[in-house]
Regions:
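Acidic, Ser/Thr/Pro
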Residues: 1-89
Length: 89
């Protein structure tokens, strides 16, 4: 499984903006759900994540805490450029 990952603290209502050079699955998860994702187990994501053909993706943190932003390349490889920023609530 190939993915890009960033862990960050977000406040409730913050919007994560993800730019990526390739269409991809982009998800926002808690630490426990990220561990499940990474280990191939069932997981839940939050904030409107999923498969994005049109970017940037906007994901909203439902509550304050540490969150994991994951860009899943879907088995693809190659050079991927991306950026992750936050718009405060």
């Amino acid at each position: 499984m190939q993915f890009l990952h960033k862990r960050m603290h977000l406040n409730a209502g913050d919007t994560v903006v993800v730019h990526c050079s390739h269409q991809s699955n982009i998800i926002l998860t808690t630490d426990s759900n990220f561990n499940n994702y990474r280990n191939g187990r069932q997981f839940q994501h939050h904030g409107g994540g999923g498969f994005f053909q049109k970017l940037p993706a906007h994901l909203r943190a439902p509550y304050s805490g540490y969150w994991n932003v994951t860009i899943d390349l879907g088995g693809g490889s190659g050079n991927v450029t991306h950026s992750i920023s936050v718009i405060p609530a």
